[in-house]
UniProtKB/Swiss-Prot annotation:
Catalyzes the transfer of the phosphoribosyl group of 5-phosphorylribose-1-pyrophosphate (PRPP) to anthranilate to yield N-(5'-phosphoribosyl)-anthranilate (PRA). Homodimer. Transmembrane segments: none annotated. Pathway: Amino-acid biosynthesis; L-tryptophan biosynthesis; L-tryptophan from chorismate: step 2/5. This is Anthranilate phosphoribosyltransferase. GO terms for molecular function: anthranilate phosphoribosyltransferase activity; magnesium ion binding. Belongs to the anthranilate phosphoribosyltransferase family. Anthranilate 2 binds at R167. Disulfide bonds: none annotated. Anthranilate 1 binds at G81, N112. One of its GO terms (cellular component) is cytosol. One of its GO terms (biological process) is L-tryptophan biosynthetic process.
Amino acid sequence: MTDLKPFLAKAASREPLTRDEARAAFDILMSGQATPSQIGGFLMALRVRGESVDEIVGAVTTMRSKMLTVEAPADAIDIVGTGGDASGTYNISTLAALIVAGAGVPVAKHGNRALSSKSGAADNLSALGVNIDVGPEIISRCIAEASVGFMFAQLHHSAMRHVGPSRVELGTRTIFNLLGPLSNPAGVRRQLLGVFSPQWLVPLAEVMRDLGSECVWVVHGDGLDEITTTGITKVAALEDGKIRTFELSPADFGVSPCVLADIKGGDGVANAAALREVLGGAKNAYRDVSLANAAASLVISGKVETIRDGMKLAAHSLDSGATALALDKLIAVSNDID
């Protein structure tokens, strides 16, 4: 089917689409076969009613089928957030990814430019000297040689160009804010996935279960799409096909609580400078919150069994210089494109 109207009518009547219907509808959207009015109407109908697990699974299935893929080890992990929390923090998941890479776990980092902050992962890494405009072969080399590679979302999801203008005109969150982090081009099956609202914790864990993920922690920390050290982090963890919910506090990581202002960042250049300060030995709130996210990621990866063991390994990665070396290698390999 190449006509969105039947799906638009069903969504407008507040009736959920089946998984197959959602897959077909998003194929129409992402193939350029729907008008801007149809795209906007359809996305807002889903938003107002509330997107279902089946609709998200169907949409992700279509998005994954159209993406430019990257080869990565089977045990690779991604540390990624939906964005949209409007917090303007430092690039926590970026530093956490480098720490995890330094600890010997391959990271296939998926990200984009800033959505609601001044610096997204792409802005931050670019300011650090990483070449983010590279193809799958170079990214695979980065993962092999630096234990971390960065996949710039807009280069891997070109079909998004068909819905981009409508999303900009709508000016509000749509289902597409959720789809990117669920569509890792390297097909990772282990993720630390931050979400902008706690209402999505269990639903997204269910989505990842239905899509075949092995271990995913979906987290929301005190308003952030990250594990936080400002207060309580809520977690929905997919492990061995089962979902459990729990909470984490700064004490669980052995760090002192901070306030949001302590981890507020700036633009890509400012955040790059802050990241390099931590690599240089600075002991501050940015270090603590990044270690916390890295520690959880090391548990998810299976490298360690407990958060405290994860903190020890993450701190060793930083303090031994392994994290800095991972960044240096990422910069070198990503720029070696002759």
